[in-house]
């Protein structure tokens, strides 16, 4: 009997403690809600200044273990406020330290709150609710820690709608998000299996297996830097006169800052490009940017954002201001000796792979106190080194030319007969200006510039002679490469 009494007493004490703690965290949530809404509205104004939307809280009802609240997104534009249209979300909040919804899932880690949110069937969303047969098209479950960090899982319901000539098929999607309390660290993961939009007369667009991941951190200058990745397994566009299939499209980026200088690497790839069933090949692009002054970039971005509306209304005046801004910030931008490289950009088909590499090293303009040169001269002075290398196997170029001819209506035999002539014609035209070389079945090109001297495929000349060669429609040559002495 004593043991039973002790057990009941312990349960009662724990229950009272849980109730008290839940009531207290509910009170904390209510206090922080206004701050959360104010911060959200500030973010909306900062990142979407022309959207004219505002978030508010309505019908907050606080209980001991749970609370309910209605978040409403209003449109501030009177012309858009028709019949009181608004987007609203109904949120159920389970109070910590052990939110009931988390306990039922055997998650016993303490948290301030657990939230379940669904969209409300308002006039603005009625059409969308009709497609989901009255269910909320988007739901979310969120966990908030005591320091304010947020973890959310957002589910988008599948859609299957057909009306007249149109058809929409969507498999649904899932988004997971981890956001720090100060909004500086954000990790996102988005996945969807299938999206198809079809029109009986216009064709269709199909997306298969889309994955998007992002892990970024906000810097003191408000740059969101980190890693991002996008992959689309298949993208198909079908129309009356086209059938394009892109397979294995990827895009990845990695950005960081060091000593107020920005660095980034951007990789793009396509596993296969097929048009009307013809496999045109695969390609990739790898781009690197290093040592870019963050403050100079921010000044340009801030000005551009502020003048975005003027850019549409007063294009010429704003363009002049942009040019002045670039000229003013160029010395700072070049102070870190920024670099840009492409290594490589390539395209590969069944007959070979063409590659292009590019390197640009920039330098500080003039010593302090020197009279600034005009913008065009500054651009020339800013280039410390510029290099480019091109390699195209003739067989690969011929195959590509034949495929393009077939896409334009030529038969296979006609395309294969025309392709070598087309390639040789283009090569001959480029060789007139010494832009390419042709040796051992390879079309190549090499360009190097430094110290006002250009070397193009072994021919050395001044920058002025190089530019004048194109302006005067004459071959670009000034000095032939040195020949080794011959022994007799």
Residue ranges and their predicted role:
Residues 1-5:
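Positively charged n-region of N-terminal signal peptides that target proteins for export
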